[in-house]
Amino acid sequence: MQESLEPEAGIGEELIEPKAEESRVPGSGRNIYDILYGNIGKKASYPALIYYGRRVTYFQLISAVDSFAAELESRFKIKKGDRIAISLPNSPQFIISFFAIVKIGAVMVPLNTGQNAANFVKKLEILHIKGIVTHSQGYTLLKDAVTEGMFVIVTRVQDFMPFEKASRITFFDSTWGKVKWGGNVYPFSDFMFGSEGSGNPVNPDDDVAIIQLTGVSLPNLQAVSLTHSNIISALRQASDVFTITGKRSIVACATPFSVPYAYLFGFLLPMGAGHPVLVFHDNHDSKTIAKLCRKTGADIMVAHPRIYSKLLFNKKTSKHLKKISIYISGTDTMSGSLASAIVDNLKGKLLQIYGFSETSGISHYRWVDDSGQPANTIGFPFKETSCKIIDQTTGEEVKVGEKGELLVNGPQSARKYLFTLIGEEDNFAGAWFHTGNIVMRNQEGSYILIEKLRDIIISDAIPVFPNEIEAVINKFPEVSESAVIGISDGNLGESIKAFVVTKDGTASCQRKLIKYLNENLAEYQRPHFYEFRNELPKSMSGKIIKRILIEQAAGRTEENTASVK
């Protein structure tokens, strides 16, 4: 990158110490951009981002955001309500694009980076995307998808890294040279030195800031519209539960910024208090994550169970996390042994967040001070969040200790789906969001998750629909039928397991099937385990009974199961 964004201090050097203060959450009548801009005064010279040793100050970050926003308006005539997609790994470029888009009243659409080309192309069409910010590796997915009038801004993961680190990555990365520049394709660096611009005033209660996908791939594409007010309300409630008070706290985020939990706790909450965020472009590289946490002195971590498992159950990585005092976990419940590794072994504080994309990523929380608590406890509703549990048959509220469907209502909740699956239009009934989760409430007012009714697997923080995977498996010539379920994979959270019935009744096609699925499924959709069977359990009507498969998978040794590493 250009010289103006060179770091002020190298990795391991002293940070300028900001004064401890509570998070500055803007009022409900404000733009999300105000969360960042509040640091332009006293904290302009403090680090906002740390990216593999490079420090970007709040002044530099705000300048980059303002420039990017002004260029979007002047070059592409972006106006309020236009939709711009971000398909990037965690990086400074993601955060710059995020704030620039919402500043001018446009709509940010986060898209997962690990998907196949056909899925990506169709998604851009359905969402009516005006432009997209992506990286050079992702450019190959959409080079043939760009329609007339759609612009593409391309960056590299190594931009914003220190020169030596960036040079090593560039040496092995050939994707930048394959980008066809010109026309409507532009390098990200061209947008860093424009004018400041003015932004557009927003009506926070009505103007959409983010279109959040709740079903991320075809044919199960779902989305909700989250307003500026929804996000700021979620942030306000989050800050009631957790306030960063340390003078030089550094928040490390190892969950994709494309999910609400991650952008809420991973950078909006820290930046609301003027603290730096430690960013990793590869959230699966646990060795590098751990070492950077140690070198920078990060003391707060935002991640999800699968990442925590990789970090904490490996002595080579866990030894680097001794300075982490607070662990925040979201997107799924955490196993008892994983909670014990944090609370008992590392003596850290553990905050578990539970929520839905439809509720801006939050509905419940719990501070885990006893690793012996049931692992499926999701905790208490946030301060401004109302919950009730109803009998699915009568619709009446159930008594304490009885099971029923969880309904959620709060200022962070979306009003309706932008588009959705047939049969789920009524999930927003009146002011209440029907979660599809069966829960119970104990005498203390804490909620316990019993069962998820919706056929969705949360794999590595991303919602996955089993029927999408089954459709691809069943197209393989040697397969007769299949069933895909989510299984508890120890401390890793949910893993994807495929039960396959072949036409010849054997597993001889296993290698070819896995190769076929790797070519036709997005990375996050690929099964972790396979089990080949002669038949699948079915009802009298011939419908596969997945409940039996789930029970069998939970209670058996995996003697007939192939694991894919």
Language-model features: locations:
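Conserved AMP-binding/adenylate-forming core of the ANL superfamily
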Residues: 28, 45-79, 85, 89-91, ...
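Conserved AMP-binding A3 loop
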Residues: 57-59, 200-201, 209-236
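AMP-binding/adenylate-forming catalytic core of the ANL superfamily
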Residues: 115, 122-123, 132-136, 410, ...
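AMP-binding/adenylate-forming catalytic domain of the ANL superfamily
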Residues: 155, 521-544, 562-565
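Gly/Ser/Thr-rich phosphate-binding loop
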Residues: 176, 298-303, 312-373, 386
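Conserved pre-ATP/AMP-binding loop-to-beta segment of ANL
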Residues: 176-213, 220, 243-250
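Conserved AMP-binding/adenylation subdomain of ANL enzymes
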Residues: 232-250, 258-300
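Conserved ATP/PPi-binding loop(s) of AMP-dependent carboxylate-activating enzymes
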Residues: 380-384, 396-426, 462-464
